[in-house]
């Protein structure tokens, strides 16, 4: 009787183990496949394609996707295949965001429209300024309001001046991104911020203001980015800043998720 019970227990254990091999070890989510069209801007297509491939692979691997496949197709396309995708929108952001990072001085108040910014300058925007939007985000990371600033066209530093970036938590337990500046850029950063204490410094990503904090003291080698992020958004921004900007514009020409296609 005891032997039969033991055998039954072993049989059940084998069934559970077999089911786990079939399901537990399989990555959750679906497979996602994308074909990307590359449009080089000021760079040879072959070089841009190689750099884009490397950058996208780095972003996906750092985001936790196991063994993503990024391959060149012809002279101007990339084929991307990722397993275990639970949030396709996140994959699109990681792949398509140029991640062009700049710090620029703000030269107007935050206003409700581009027209209001122009009115602030009596209808004539100075040639060294441009108007950029800021999406103010709520607790869930979604945009709840848009404001506009006049900011200097010339950046103080760019993403190429960053040594590293990492997600963190701010003084009020809100997600942030902390960054460090390369040694060769610290003197420029310190001089510019030291001469503009009391002014606002716009943190610009892909032509949009993420936040525009006031400079309270001279800054030389580090800073933080606050923008009403979720933890995942802060993590992804840090990943994109570390990987650097894409060398060319990418357009999704085909997308398949779990066997379903969408152009």
What is each model feature region?
Residues 2-12:
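Bacterial N-terminal signal peptides that target proteins for export
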Residues 3, 162, 252-256:
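A structural signal for short, hydrophobic beta-strand segments that form beta-sheets
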Residues 11-22:
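Bacterial N-terminal signal peptides
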Residues 25-27, 32-215, 223, 237, ...:
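Non-transmembrane, solvent-exposed regions of membrane trafficking/translocation machinery
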Residues 84, 238, 254-263:
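Alpha-helical membrane-interface segments at transmembrane helix boundaries
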Residues 222-255:
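Extended, hydrophilic extramembrane loops/domains of integral membrane proteins
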């Amino acid at each position: 009787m005891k032997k039969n019970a033991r055998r039954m227990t072993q049989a059940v254990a084998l069934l559970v183990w077999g089911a786990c091999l079939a399901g537990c070890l399989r990555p959750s989510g679906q497979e996602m496949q994308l074909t990307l069209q590359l449009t080089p801007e000021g760079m040879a297509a072959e070089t841009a394609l190689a750099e884009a491939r490397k950058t996208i692979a780095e972003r996906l691997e750092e985001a936790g996707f196991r063994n993503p496949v990024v391959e060149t197709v012809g002279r101007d396309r990339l084929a991307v295949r990722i397993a275990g995708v639970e949030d396709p929108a996140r994959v699109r952001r990681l792949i398509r965001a140029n991640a062009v990072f700049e710090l620029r001085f703000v030269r107007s108040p935050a206003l409700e429209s581009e027209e209001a910014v122009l009115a602030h300058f009596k209808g004539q925007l100075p040639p060294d300024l441009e108007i950029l939007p800021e999406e103010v985000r709520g607790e869930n990371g979604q945009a709840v309001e848009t404001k506009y600033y006049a900011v200097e066209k010339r950046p103080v530093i760019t993403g190429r001046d960053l040594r590293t970036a990492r997600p963190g938590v701010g003084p009020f337990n809100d997600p942030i991104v902390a960054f460090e500046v390369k040694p060769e850029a610290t003197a420029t950063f310190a001089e510019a911020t030291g001469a503009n204490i009391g002014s606002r410094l716009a943190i610009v990503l892909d032509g949009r203001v993420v936040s525009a904090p006031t400079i309270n003291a001279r800054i030389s080698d580090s800073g933080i980015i606050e923008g009403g992020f979720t933890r995942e958004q802060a993590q992804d921004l840090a990943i994109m800043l570390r990987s650097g900007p894409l060398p060319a514009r990418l357009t999704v020409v085909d997308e398949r998720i779990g066997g379903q296609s969408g152009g």
